[in-house]
Each structure stands twice: as C-alpha cells, then as structure tokens.
Amino acid sequence: MSESEVAGQRYRVGYALQGKKVESFIQPSLLDHAKQHSIDLVQIDPTAPLQQQGPFHCIIHKLHTQHWKNLLQQFSSKHPNTVIIDPPELVDRLHNRVSMLDAVTHLQFSLENATIGVPKQVVVNEPKSFDLHKFEEEQGLRFPVIAKPLAADGGAGSHELCLVFDEEGLHALSVPMVLQEFVNHGGVVFKIYVAGQRVNCVKRKSLGDITEEKLKVLRGSLPFSRVSSLGVEDEGGGAVEDAEMPPQSLVGELARGLREALGLNLFNVDVIRDGKEPTRYLVIDINYFPGYAKLPSYEPFITDFLLDIVRSKTA
C-alpha cells in the first residue's frame, strides 16, 4: 500500500462496552485524537445485528454475555478480515483467578538482576471447613492471606478482596475463594498497561507492610477498603513517589511474554516487589481491558495501538 493511500485511508473501529466503561474510556479527548489520526470510533449496539452496523476494520469489546459472543462469532465468520480485540474464549481465562496466573508460571525468559513469579495460593471451595494449616506444612502458605473471589469476571462481588488473619476470619467467608500469600512490598504496586506492542508502567499505592508486632493483635478478617483503619498502610514506610521502578527489561519481557501466552492485546498486570528480596517480583493480578484513561496521555497510547492493528491488517 502506497503512502498516499495510507494518508487518505480512514478506519472504522467499533466498540462494544458497558455504560460505565463507555463513560470512562470513550472520552471526547480520545475520540478527537483518534479522529485526527484517521480512526473513527463507532459505538456498537449489542442488541442489534452487527451486520447492519458495519463495516468495521476492528472491533474492541468488553461484554461477556453469551448473546454477544454469538453475535461476534457470526459476524467474524462472515467478515474474517475484521480484527476482533480480543477473542472472547481467550478473555475468559482471565475470569478465573487461578488460570489467569498460570501463564506467568510458564513464561520462558531470563533476567540478569530480577526474577518474576506468582505468590503461593490455593483454591478454597468451602471456606467454612477449610484448614490452612495443612497447606502451611505442604506449601508454606500461612496467615495472613489475601482472600479473592475465584471469579474475576467484573461482577459486583469479584472485587471484594479481604485480608484474613486467622481461621475464624477464613471460616467467615462464603463464596469459593483463592487464598494468596500476603507479601510485604512497601505499599507500592506496579501496574503494567499493555495495548499490543505498546507498554506503560506506573506505580500506585497498595496495602502497606504488616509488622510481626501488628500480626500478634490482628484477628478475623478485614475488607481492603478498611485496612487503612488499622494503620497498616503506613507500616511500610516507603512512599509511592520514592519507590524505584522495576527494570525496563522486566517490564518489556513480562508484557511481551504474557501477550503471547494469553493471546491478548488489552490488559494490565499488577506486580509487587518482595520487601525481603528486592530482586523478586510477583504478579498478583491480571485484568482485561483495564482503566486506560488513568494513564497519562492515554489517547495516543490507545490510538497508536489501534493504528498498529488496522494498518497491519490492511497492509
């Protein structure tokens, strides 16, 4: 394709998102920036046939109903040149907190001054009768632990995380959970945003460190939203602004490795640095189609990604 053809080419990118996601992601600044760079972002009505709303060079989406998946499959079979970001069956892997981290354990890359892994964790289907001490002997998993609903599908309950300090707190839980070891990490989480080949890492405030003295008096469990009431968040000491960023080589390799292993383009990775071993990094969560608008200059970040996709398909 000649440069003159590329210069005159416009691309239609359809988006199918829930109302809140439209408000946060499809901001006027993104629409304008994309439009200035030959991309027209078009809202898709998921209740109407896609055939009547096209043509599309690319479709981005974050809807999980079976009806939507069927619509997408039917449209894709008739329009194989339309790029679907991303295939629903691959996105589904991130809806389970065990399968989402499986990909990390199979990554094949070596870093000179750092290691990457996942925290120890176990699935608990019946929290009321679970005995963590057995797993303490076998796997070294001990209190405190972070309890996360097994389902990470974006539903109301999937974000209800809590810190569990003992058996009493564990038995008070109800839904199937993943218990993940709590690792002191200086109160900072590194969020690696991925959009295809585009990668951006930012640091954010996280749960603070918990001292051995504090552990002696903590009982039961506490939702993340109330952890600050314990004074725990200030135990770690290091402020977010003072935290050193992970090596760029780690950020780039982790993004590339997960993009290939998951087969996905739009996701972010939550990474912490072990407070006891500063070269040990742990992936604690992977989210599909995260809040990109929180990134500085997210408009060119997303627009450049979309251009990468549509131009590679039409080249």
From Swiss-Prot:
It catalyses: 1D-myo-inositol 1,3,4-trisphosphate + ATP = 1D-myo-inositol 1,3,4,5-tetrakisphosphate + ADP + H(+); 1D-myo-inositol 1,3,4-trisphosphate + ATP = 1D-myo-inositol 1,3,4,6-tetrakisphosphate + ADP + H(+); 1D-myo-inositol 3,4,5,6-tetrakisphosphate + ATP = 1D-myo-inositol 1,3,4,5,6-pentakisphosphate + ADP + H(+); 1D-myo-inositol 3,4,6-trisphosphate + ATP = 1D-myo-inositol 1,3,4,6-tetrakisphosphate + ADP + H(+). One of its GO terms (molecular function) is inositol-1,3,4-trisphosphate 5-kinase activity. Expressed in seeds. Mainly expressed in seedlings, and, to a lower extent, in roots, flowers, stems and leaves. Its cofactor is Mg(2+). Induction: Induced by drought (early dehydration responsive) and salinity stress. Triggered by abscisic acid (ABA). It holds the Pfam family Ins134_P3_kin. Transmembrane segments: none annotated. Mg(2+) 2 binds at D285, N287. Mg(2+) 1 binds at D270, D285. One of its GO terms (biological process) is response to abscisic acid. SUPFAM superfamilies: Glutathione synthetase ATP-binding domain-like (SSF56059). The keyword Glycosyltransferase does not apply. Kinase that can phosphorylate various inositol polyphosphate such as Ins(3,4,5,6)P4, Ins(3,4,6)P3 and Ins(1,3,4)P3. May participate in an inositol lipid-independent pathway of InsP6 synthesis. Barely able to add a beta-phosphate to InsP6 to yield 5-InsP7, thus exhibiting negligible InsP6 kinase activity. Also has Ins(1,3,4,5,6)P5 phosphatase activity. Probably involved in the regulation of drought and salinity tolerance by diverting the flux of inositol phosphate pool towards phytate biosynthesis. Monomer. This is Inositol-tetrakisphosphate 1-kinase 2. It comes from Glycine max. The gene is ITPK2.
